[in-house]
């Protein structure tokens, strides 16, 4: 997210605590917060999708649901053509 938008979120939060927000400012704050949260969720999802879990013996123990997502995206050498990957 653009640093200017994050600064604006913080500015509106501070103003809300001190003098309160106008109607249009409340709408702006809600939109900015939603945009921030969506970006955060995308980032976390991307990070989690890139994880491969292995046990002490080096065996892949990644949950099947995550493996399927990784197959669809071609991550960690997984392929839709090879269901065992």
UniProtKB/Swiss-Prot annotation:
Residues 62-85 are annotated as: Disordered. It is found in: Cytoplasm. SUPFAM superfamilies: YnzC-like (SSF158221). Keywords: Cytoplasm. The keyword Cytoplasm applies. The keyword Cytoplasm applies. InterPro entries: DUF896 (IPR009242). Coiled coil: none annotated. GO terms for cellular component: cytoplasm. Belongs to the UPF0291 family. HAMAP family: UPF0291 (MF_01103). This is UPF0291 protein SPy_1687/M5005_Spy1383. It comes from Streptococcus pyogenes serotype M1. The lineage of its organism: Bacteria, Bacillati, Bacillota, Bacilli, Lactobacillales.
């Amino acid at each position: 997210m653009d640093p200017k938008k994050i600064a604006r979120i913080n500015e509106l939060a501070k103003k809300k605590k001190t003098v309160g927000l106008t109607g249009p400012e409340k709408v702006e704050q809600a939109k900015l917060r939603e945009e921030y949260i969506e970006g955060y969720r995308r980032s976390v999802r991307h990070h989690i999708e890139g994880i491969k879990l292995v046990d002490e013996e080096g065996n892949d123990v990644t949950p099947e649901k995550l493996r399927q997502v990784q197959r669809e995206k071609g991550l960690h050498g997984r392929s839709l053509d090879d269901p065992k990957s």
